[in-house]
């Protein structure tokens, strides 16, 4: 008898990580070239199972391979929730940025230049969700606003086991691409919203910066 919001994440559709690139087909099982590796009907089935109870999606037209968007808003008990898809439109790193670690999405060089991977053509949320958040943020009819997403807008977890395995950038996190991350946080800030996300394995409270860190 309690409302429940579920957001499909990478493991739900059979991938270790997901950079959806608007629903395109990935040619790699690890998915880091961007897109979905498994059959689109399977992807759509998973998303129906986990999001069919949500309000109608903001964007109704199908994306690539017929995969649909589900990002939407939901008002419960005086709180206006924006439910966004931070994986579905995101660019995959493989072949788009210089490789600086053991994997296309892992950078372990402490001297790397963040601007070398912050390329303007790379996408995080994309124009459709920027438009949605602009409109949602301008509605002040609720007591409180909150944004829900699959993962956070930073690399909150840096260690994968030993200290020698520290990642200086994990491109699965929404800290990348940085310009997309900054745009998302700017829209969340303008809305006066808090942000609640999953995925990073460790409970973390983060105070984000946009101009200063």
Predicted regions and their residues:
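Long, structured stretches of catalytic cores involved in phosphate-ester chemistry, encompassing
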Residues: 1-213
């Amino acid at each position: 008898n309690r409302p429940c919001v579920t957001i499909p994440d990478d493991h739900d559709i059979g991938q270790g990580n997901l950079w959806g690139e608007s629903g395109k087909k990935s040619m790699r099982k690890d998915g880091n070239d961007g897109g979905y590796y498994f059959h689109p009907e399977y992807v759509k089935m998973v998303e129906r199972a986990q999001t069919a109870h949500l309000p109608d999606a903001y964007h109704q037209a199908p994306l690539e391979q017929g995969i649909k968007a589900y990002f939407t808003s939901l008002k419960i008990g005086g709180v206006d929730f924006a439910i966004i898809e931070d994986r579905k439109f995101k660019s995959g790193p493989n072949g788009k940025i210089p490789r600086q670690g053991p994997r296309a999405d892992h950078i372990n060089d402490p001297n790397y230049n963040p601007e070398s991977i912050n390329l303007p053509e790379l996408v995080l949320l994309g124009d459709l969700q920027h438009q949605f958040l602009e409109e949602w943020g301008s509605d002040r009819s609720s007591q409180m606003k909150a944004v829900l997403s699959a993962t956070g807008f930073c690399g909150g977890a840096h260690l994968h086991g030993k200290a020698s395995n520290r990642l200086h950038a994990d491109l699965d996190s929404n800290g990348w691409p940085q310009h997309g991350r900054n745009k998302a946080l700017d829209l969340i800030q303008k809305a006066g919203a808090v942000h609640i996300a999953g995925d990073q394995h460790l409970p973390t409270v983060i105070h984000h910066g946009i101009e200063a860190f």
